[in-house]
């Protein structure tokens, strides 16, 4: 399926010079969204994932349905101050700023096979921070899956030690 036809490009958002790839139009089409989730779930199953991990917020709308499809757990990664129990944290840079992510200390068990999911790979900062926390907790990142890769930004280089999969790439 040509998923790009379901992505809306928004110029100069959230700041000037950014060509934002809006996945909400993909999600609004039930067939396209379902097929995208199914393709990403096949990848996660091939990686023998025990759990799916996704950063907020769009990582939730990608990762939760994959976890449901595979009948495995989903672990949310949230911005600082959003998780109620004891957490570890990692700072990261993104396409248009900097922030801090957290994950519950008890959310990943040593040796668990983890597939990280998100809507988009740009600089790789968000996913690098997420992977670092998963590994700090003893998990093994066996794959990382995206709806979209912005290849021209080069985030893949930052994540070269991991197996990456994306449904769409923008050069």
UniProtKB/Swiss-Prot annotation:
It is found in: Cytoplasm. Its EC number is 2.4.2.7. Keywords: Cytoplasm, Glycosyltransferase, Purine salvage, Transferase. GO terms for biological process: adenine salvage; AMP salvage; purine ribonucleoside salvage. It catalyses: AMP + diphosphate = 5-phospho-alpha-D-ribose 1-diphosphate + adenine. Pathway: Purine metabolism; AMP biosynthesis via salvage pathway; AMP from adenine: step 1/1. InterPro entries: Ade_phspho_trans, PRibTrfase_dom, PRTase-like, UPRTase/APRTase. One of its GO terms (molecular function) is adenine phosphoribosyltransferase activity. Its main location: cytoplasm. It comes from the Bacteria. Homodimer. NCBIfam families: apt, PRK02304.1-2, PRK02304.1-3, PRK02304.1-5. Catalyzes a salvage reaction resulting in the formation of AMP, that is energically less costly than de novo synthesis. This is Adenine phosphoribosyltransferase. It comes from Shouchella clausii (strain KSM-K16) (Alkalihalobacillus clausii).
């Amino acid at each position: 399926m040509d998923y790009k036809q379901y992505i809306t490009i928004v110029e100069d958002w959230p700041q000037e010079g950014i060509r934002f790839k809006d996945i909400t139009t993909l999600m609004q089409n039930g067939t396209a969204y379902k097929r995208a989730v199914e393709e990403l779930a096949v990848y996660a199953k091939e990686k023998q994932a025990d759990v799916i991990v996704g950063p907020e917020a769009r990582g939730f709308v990608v990762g939760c349905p994959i976890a449901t499809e595979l009948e495995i757990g989903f672990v949310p990664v949230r911005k600082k101050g959003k998780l109620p129990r004891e957490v570890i944290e990692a700072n990261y840079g993104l396409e248009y700023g900097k922030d801090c992510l957290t994950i519950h200390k008890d959310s990943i068990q040593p040796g668990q096979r983890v597939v990280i999911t998100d809507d988009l790979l740009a600089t790789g900062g968000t996913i690098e921070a997420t992977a670092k926390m998963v590994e700090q907790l003893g998990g093994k990142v066996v794959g990382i899956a995206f709806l979209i890769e912005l290849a021209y930004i080069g985030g893949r280089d930052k994540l070269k030690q991991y197996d990456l999969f994306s449904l769409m790439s923008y050069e």
